[in-house]
Regions:
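Short beta-strand/loop motif that positions the catalytic acidic residue
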Residues: 216-218, 222
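Short beta-strand element of the alpha/beta-hydrolase
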Residues: 61-71
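C-terminal catalytic histidine-bearing segment of alpha/beta-hydrolase fold enzymes
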Residues: 231, 238-288
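Mobile cap/lid helix-loop segments that gate and shape the active-site cleft of serine hydrolases
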Residues: 30, 46, 176-206, 212
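Conserved alpha/beta-hydrolase "acid-adjacent" motif
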Residues: 223-229
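Catalytic nucleophile-loop/oxyanion-hole region of alpha/beta-hydrolase
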Residues: 76-80, 84, 96-133, 263-266
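Primarily recognizes the serine-hydrolase "nucleophile elbow" in alpha/beta-hydrolase
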Residues: 117-186, 198-199
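N-terminal cap/lid segment of alpha/beta-hydrolase-fold proteins
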Residues: 19-59
Length: 288
C-alpha cells in the first residue's frame, strides 16, 4: 500500500495528536504486515457496542490488552486508534479497542457499563483470537485512562458482568484524570450528574489493598490533564500497599503519550514501557 509519508509526517508534527487530523496522520503510516484485524464485532445490543480486535501474526498465545480511547467522554471512535492496536499486535499482544456510549447521548456510569461489557466479551472470546484470558490487561489514554483505572478499582462494574479485578494482570494509565474534583469544564457537571454522586467518578476514591498492578505515565507538559492526577493516585496506591509504577516525561504534552504508539512518534518511550510491564506482570500469578 502506498504511503504519503511526507504529508503524514507534517501532519503528525504540526497537529496535536488527539485532533482528528492528527489521528488520521498517525493511522496513515500504520503497517498492515505484522498483524490482522477483525472489525465491528458486536459486544452488546446498543449501536455503540462494537469493537475491533488486532491480532499478532504469529500463532502463539498472547497477552490481551483492552484499550480505552480518550475524548473527554464525549468524542472518539475506535477507528481513530488503529495505530495503537497495530503497534501492540505487531509486538505480539492481542488488542481490543471498543466504542462506548458518549455524552450527551449517555452519561456516567453508562460508559463504565459498556467498558465492563467489552472486557467480559474480550475475556470470553480470547481463546478464539489466540489470546490468553489469564493475561488480561487494561490500558487507556486521557478519559480512557479514567475508565480503565476506575474499572479496576471500583468493583461494581466488573461484578455486573460476573467478574472482578482478579481478572486483570495489570492496568496502564496514560495522561489520565483520577482525582479531578471540582470539575474545571462545566459540561462535566452534567456528564457525572447528580452532584451528590460526583465522588463515584473519582478513581482515587476507590483505592484499596490488592488492586491490580498499575503503570501510570504522564507528560509534565500536559496542559489538559494535570500530572498531579497521576501523582495523587500513585501516592494513594502506594499507601495502600499496591503495586504501582510511575513515569513522567519532561515536556511531553497530553497527546504525546498516545501518539508515541505510532511509527512517526516513538518518543516518549511509552510502547517499550508498556511491553515491559505486560511481560513482567504476565509472568506473575494472579490469585483467584
Amino acid at each position: 500500500m502506498k504511503r504519503t509519508w511526507p504529508i503524514a509526517l507534517a501532519l503528525a508534527c504540526c497537529l496535536n495528536a488527539c485532533t482528528g487530523l492528527g489521528l488520521l496522520a498517525l493511522n496513515t503510516v500504520s503497517t498492515f504486515q505484522s498483524y490482522s484485524r477483525q472489525s465491528n464485532i458486536a459486544y452488546g445490543p446498543a449501536a455503540a457496542n462494537r469493537l475491533d480486535v488486532y491480532l499478532p501474526a504469529h500463532g502463539a498465545p498472547s497477552a490481551l490488552v483492552v484499550f480505552f480511547y480518550g475524548g473527554g467522554w464525549n468524542s472518539g471512535d475506535k477507528a481513530n486508534y488503529r495505530f495503537v492496536g497495530a503497534a501492540l499486535a505487531a509486538a505480539g499482544i492481542a488488542t481490543v479497542i471498543h466504542n462506548y456510549a458518549l455524552y450527551p447521548k449517555a452519561r456516567f456510569p453508562q460508559f463504565m457499563r459498556d467498558a465492563a461489557a467489552a472486557v467480559a466479551f474480550a475475556r470470553a472470546h480470547a481463546h478464539e483470537w489466540g489470546a490468553d484470558p489469564a493475561r488480561l490487561f487494561l490500558m487507556g489514554h486521557s478519559a480512557g485512562a479514567h475508565i480503565a483505572v476506575l474499572l479496576a478499582l471500583d468493583q461494581e462494574y466488573l461484578h455486573q458482568v460476573g467478574g472482578d479485578a482478579r481478572w486483570l494482570r495489570g492496568v496502564v494509565g496514560l495522561s489520565g484524570p483520577y482525582d479531578f474534583l471540582p470539575f474545571t469544564d462545566a459540561y462535566l457537571n452534567d456528564v457525572f450528574a447528580p452532584s451528590s454522586e460526583f465522588y463515584r467518578s473519582q478513581p482515587i476514591n476507590y483505592v484499596h489493598a490488592n488492586a491490580p498492578p498499575m503503570l501510570l505515565m504522564h507528560g509534565l507538559g500536559d496542559k489538559r490533564v494535570s500530572p498531579n492526577n497521576t501523582r495523587s493516585l500513585a501516592a494513594r496506591l502506594e499507601a495502600a500497599g499496591d503495586d504501582v509504577s510511575t513515569r513522567y516525561f519532561p515536556g511531553a504534552s497530553h497527546g504525546d503519550l498516545a501518539a508515541a504508539f505510532s511509527p512517526l512518534r516513538k518518543q516518549p518511550p511509552v510502547l517499550p514501557l508498556v511491553l515491559e510491564f505486560v511481560a513482567a506482570k504476565s509472568a506473575l500469578p494472579r490469585g483467584d
